[in-house]
Amino acid sequence: MAVPNELKYSKEHEWVKVEGNVATIGITEYAQSELGDIVFVELPETDDEINEGDTFGSVESVKTVSELYAPISGKVVEVNEELEDSPEFVNESPYEKAWMVKVEISDESQLEALLTAEKYSEMIGE
């Protein structure tokens, strides 16, 4: 199962890619495989504020609905609108086409609480 080294991970199975003061957030390959076929993705609006640990959307699969938890706090600067029409991208390409939101980071110290790829792999038993 892919766990890219350049990303950071939350214990709730979100990944974070940091570029400058913007973090791109999505769900991991492990999370999508546990959920099964994704049929709907609900995301926040651009300019919404999200707070670390709070829900910022949900992913609905044929099995269940799973909340998305913000791994960091910040202002949503971009939302992946393609997921509205193509939620299957979450299954097909969780780290590329299925990024969910881009957030302007409000507290960089929150990044320190995220897991490295190695620690995340250990957590999921890989």
Swiss-Prot record:
Protein name, as recorded: Glycine cleavage system H protein
Comment on bound cofactor: Binds 1 lipoyl cofactor covalently.
- From the UniProt record, report the name of the gene that encodes this protein: gcvH
Give a short account of what the protein does.
Answer: The glycine cleavage system catalyzes the degradation of glycine. The H protein shuttles the methylamine group of glycine from the P protein to the T protein. Is also involved in protein lipoylation via its role as an octanoyl/lipoyl carrier protein intermediate.
- The species this protein was found in: Staphylococcus aureus (strain JH9)
Q: Which domain of life is it from?
A: Bacteria
- Looking at the keywords, is Zinc present? no
Gene Ontology biological process terms in this record: glycine decarboxylation via glycine cleavage system
Indicate the family of this protein: Belongs to the GcvH family.
Q: Which Gene3D superfamilies match?
A: 2.40.50.100
Q: Name one GO cellular component term.
A: glycine cleavage complex
Q: Which Pfam family, any one, appears in the UniProt record?
A: GCV_H
| Alphabetically ordered keywords of this record | Lipoyl
What is known about its subunit structure? The glycine cleavage system is composed of four proteins: P, T, L and H.
- Which residues does this entry mark as bearing N6-lipoyllysine? 63
The Swiss-Prot or TrEMBL record lists the needed cofactor(s) as: (R)-lipoate
**Occurrences of domain Lipoyl-binding (ranges):** 22-104
- Origin organism lineage: Bacteria, Bacillati, Bacillota, Bacilli, Bacillales
